[in-house]
Amino acid sequence: MSEAIIAKKAEQVAIVADKMKAAASIVVVDSRGLTVDQDTVLRRNLRESGVEFKVIKNSILSRAAEKAGLEDLKKLFVGPSAVAFSNEDVIAPAKVISEFAKGAEALEIKGGVVDGAITSVEEINALASLPNKEGMLSMLLSVLQAPVRNVAYAVKAVAESKEDGAA
């Protein structure tokens, strides 16, 4: 191989390794068998959720995983592999891909990484069933508001009973 090709591949490995290090979550899939229309819809759904989706050679993925300190991820890079990276939302790649896989049997989830830990297909599917960040924040907010609301109702009830007693 020429030095130019080796340099280009080394650059690709470095770019992918940086993406792996920066990612909040990574989902690895086998998209073999998807139609062009299905692939287009999947990519659009991922892009709308802020997820980067790439088909990358297994040799580059393996070297990048090693460089990123994710050696155990290399076992997923067998056969055609596509990788979804999300730097912000941990749940987005799992949720979009799992939802899409329900309607497209050709899409196979191989596993992934969440906050630096290798995850199985089952863990990816469990993650996909969680609400997104906004949903979790709204649940937390409602839990935090409940005691305040109860105190307000109690104060209102006491005030109303005193008004009734004074009249």
From Swiss-Prot:
The keyword RNA-binding applies. One of its GO terms (cellular component) is large ribosomal subunit. Belongs to the universal ribosomal protein uL10 family. Forms part of the ribosomal stalk, playing a central role in the interaction of the ribosome with GTP-bound translation factors. Keywords: Ribonucleoprotein, Ribosomal protein, RNA-binding, rRNA-binding. The gene is rplJ. Part of the ribosomal stalk of the 50S ribosomal subunit. The N-terminus interacts with L11 and the large rRNA to form the base of the stalk. The C-terminus forms an elongated spine to which L12 dimers bind in a sequential fashion forming a multimeric L10(L12)X complex. GO terms for molecular function: large ribosomal subunit rRNA binding; structural constituent of ribosome. It holds the Pfam family Ribosomal_L10. CDD domains: Ribosomal_L10. HAMAP family: Ribosomal_uL10. This is Large ribosomal subunit protein uL10. GO terms for biological process: translation. InterPro entries: Ribosomal_uL10 (IPR001790), Ribosomal_uL10-like_sf (IPR043141), Ribosomal_uL10_bac (IPR022973), Ribosomal_uL10_bac_type (IPR047865), Ribosomal_uL10_CS_bac (IPR002363).
